[in-house]
Amino acid sequence: MDFPIRSQARLYPAQCVTFCLYVRVPPLSEWNFLKMQTDARPSATWPSVPKVHKRNRSTSLSDQQTAKKAHANHARLHLPQPIEPVYESQNGSVSQSEEKSSAVEINNSAAGDPQRFAVADLNFSWAEEEEKVVLAPYDYVASNSGKEFRTLILNAFNAWFRVPPESLTIICDVVRMLHTSSLLIDDIQDNSLLRRGRPVAHSIYGVAQTINTGNYVYFLAAKELNKLRNAASALEVFTAEMLNLHRGQGQELYWRDTLKCPTEDEYLKMVSNKTGGLFRMAVKLMQAESPAGPMAPVCDKLVQLLGLVYQIADDYKNLTAVEYTTSKGFCEDLTEGKFSFPVVHSIQSRPEDRRLYQILAQKTTEVEVKKYAVSYIESTGSLEYTKQVVRVLVQRARDELSRIDQGRERNQEMHALLGKMALE
């Protein structure tokens, strides 16, 4: 049977609205049944407020509001109050009231006693698990290693330097750490999407964490140098070449962001600082650790040539090689807006034509637009010109290699590496 209950609600100062609230009052038989159930099972819940299973200790705001309204309505209508819902947790069943008091206790416990700071040991140690968190972006890239070309070059140079194995291992590790950590930063600065065929680290770990990790590993590498026999000299070399690396990177970013095309010589100087810096650092560290000491061969010119060949050949492959499309994306240098060696030559060949400027400014990801850019670069003879430059530099490096080797052809590893770098 339904009974209307009249009430008045004041909605506006000058207006009252009368409304009817209809409540269904159960028949006497149902009341007796419910009373028997609640007497027999005091833990039973009111039918309209079901028991909740597998909940966390913290209840949501909506659950608390619903429970309060249910209690208020039953009290106003003189109905039996529903049993407070019970929530199951890992520590057993708890009610909402117990939940609140427990939460207060937890908060008070978390706050703790301020006096503990008077005697507490505040000398914290760095845990291995914490180190893993900070190094996660680096480990992600390092786990997908590349060609290890720099390690091959160091092994080839060691035919002359004869660096002790333990020192050579440290130098190779330092070079690998610096190269990998620089990739973390480069990918952010270039807005890259892929690195070695996988999503770039900052797309997974975030930009801020990836930058922090890249910088952190720079200092870890410097710390490793303290293990070398000539640690003081090694740190001087490290500092000088890291400065050169950042100078070269700064130049390249400036040209890209201001859409200023460098001259060929400006480009070569940038490459000498950016790419050649890491090669020079490695070779100078090996010279410092070599048992030959001052009698060790001077390889500065060869290292310089290797850095130029490596970068210019890389620029060429980025626009032409299929494997680069798989690992980095199709013509990624064009998407980055980069003034690579073929692009610089193409623009200078036709300075009045602004088409390449416009394409670089857009940082386009459209494949057809990039295909058109490559065909334009090819039409200016820039791809063939780049191949010829690499060929000349490789031959010059071979001549320098023969000079260092004094015609004895001892360093066959270096000859083999130069053969791989040539664009034949």
From Swiss-Prot:
Q: Where does Mg(2+) 2 bind?
A: D186, D190
The cofactor required is: Mg(2+)
- Source organism (scientific name): Phomopsis amygdali (Fusicoccum amygdali)
Keyword annotations from UniProtKB, A to Z: Cytoplasm, Isoprene biosynthesis, Magnesium, Metal-binding, Transferase
Biological process (GO) annotations held by this record are: alcohol biosynthetic process; farnesyl diphosphate biosynthetic process; geranyl diphosphate biosynthetic process; geranylgeranyl diphosphate biosynthetic process; mycotoxin biosynthetic process
The entry's protein name is: Geranylgeranyl pyrophosphate synthase D
What are the binding positions for isopentenyl diphosphate in this chain?
K147, R150, H179, R196
Against InterPro entries, the record matches this protein to: Isoprenoid_synthase_dom_sf, Polyprenyl_synt, Polyprenyl_synt_CS
